[in-house]
C-alpha cells in the first residue's frame, strides 16, 4: 500500500497507511511519517511515536489512531517544541504507572502523573532535562 498518496520522500518504512490514515496528503509524508499530522497518536503518546516506528498504520493504531492527537501537540517533527523539546528525538512516549489511566505520563522524561486524570499534564511528553 502506498504512503498516503505521497510521491517520494517516504520510502517503504511508511507503508501501510493508505486511506486508513484519513485524508493524508503530501504534507504528511515529510520526512518519513505518513501518519501525521492528520492521523497520528492520541494524547497518551508523544509527537514522536509515529515517526519512531516508521509512521505505519500499525503504529498509529497502537496509540488509538485518532486524527486529532498529534495536532494537539504540534502534529509534526517540529511540533515537539510545544512539548518542551527542540527536536522530536528528545520526546518519548510514556504512561502512568497508576492513578490516572492512559491519558497522562509518568517517566523521567515527563511531568509527574497527577492523582486525578483531569489534572494530568502534559498532552505529550516533556523533553528530558
Swiss-Prot record:
It comes from the Eukaryota. Residues 28-112 are annotated as: 6 X 4 AA repeats of C-C-X-P. Expressed in hair root and not in skin. Expressed also in liver and skeletal muscle. The keyword Repeat applies. Keywords: Keratin, Repeat. One of its GO terms (cellular component) is cytosol. Sequence repeats lie at residues 28-31, 34-37, 40-43, 90-93, 109-112, 119-122. The keyword DNA-binding does not apply. In the hair cortex, hair keratin intermediate filaments are embedded in an interfilamentous matrix, consisting of hair keratin-associated protein (KRTAP), which are essential for the formation of a rigid and resistant hair shaft through their extensive disulfide bond cross-linking with abundant cysteine residues of hair keratins. The matrix proteins include the high-sulfur and high-glycine-tyrosine keratins. Interacts with hair keratins. Belongs to the KRTAP type 5 family. This is Keratin-associated protein 5-6. It comes from Homo sapiens (Human).
Amino acid at each position: 500500500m502506498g504512503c498516503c498518496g505521497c510521491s517520494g520522500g517516504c520510502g517503504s518504512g511508511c507503508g501501510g497507511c493508505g486511506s486508513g490514515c484519513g485524508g493524508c496528503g503530501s504534507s504528511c509524508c515529510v520526512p518519513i511519517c505518513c501518519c501525521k499530522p492528520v492521523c497520528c497518536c492520541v494524547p497518551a503518546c508523544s509527537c514522536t511515536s509515529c515517526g519512531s516506528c516508521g509512521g505505519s498504520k500499525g503504529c498509529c493504531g497502537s496509540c488509538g489512531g485518532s486524527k486529532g492527537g498529534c495536532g494537539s501537540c504540534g502534529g509534526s517533527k517540529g511540533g515537539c517544541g510545544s512539548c518542551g523539546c527542540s527536536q522530536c528525538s528528545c520526546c518519548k512516549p510514556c504512561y502512568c504507572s497508576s492513578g490516572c489511566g492512559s491519558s497522562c505520563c509518568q517517566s523521567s522524561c515527563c511531568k509527574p502523573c497527577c492523582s486525578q486524570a483531569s489534572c494530568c499534564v502534559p498532552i505529550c511528553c516533556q523533553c528530558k532535562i
